[in-house]
């Protein structure tokens, strides 16, 4: 397998979380909370949860997105995508310490404040680099 995380050595598993905001939030308010409140919380718990890397991709570029969606007949874009890299599935399964459970619960409670969880799919998968320039 050619799994990897640029510059971080081999990584076996990646979590991708496609986020939709709660209906009462504007995209700007959602992204600000996600960046300024939730991101530091993830950083605080990263070591406890075994998170090697955490990236937020905030939706923007509305004209480009509209063109792409129109040409494909696709659904409305997500408000953002979170990507989290972990050492392995086994390491995640073994991470059942009281501190890890508490950290995960704290993150979930915070997510309920700004993410429409019922409409925000997430999954674990493996990366396969096809093009990696720069």
Predicted feature descriptions by range:
Residues 11-134:
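Macromolecular interaction modules
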Residues 1-11:
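Short, Lys/Arg-enriched N-terminal segments with co-localized hydrophobic residues
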């Amino acid at each position: 397998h050619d799994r990897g995380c640029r510059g971080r050595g081999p990584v076996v598993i990646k979590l991708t979380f496609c986020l939709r905001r709660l209906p009462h939030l504007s995209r700007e308010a959602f992204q600000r909370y996600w960046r300024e409140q939730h991101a530091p919380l993830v950083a605080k718990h990263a070591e406890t949860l075994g998170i090697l890397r955490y990236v937020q991709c905030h939706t923007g570029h509305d004209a480009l997105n509209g063109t792409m969606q129109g040409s494909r007949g696709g659904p409305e874009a997500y408000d953002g995508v979170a990507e989290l890299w972990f050492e392995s599935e086994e390491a995640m399964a073994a991470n059942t310490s009281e501190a890890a459970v508490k950290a995960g619960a704290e993150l979930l409670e915070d997510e309920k404040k700004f993410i429409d969880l019922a409409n925000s799919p997430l999954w674990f998968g493996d990366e396969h680099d096809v093009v990696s320039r720069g």
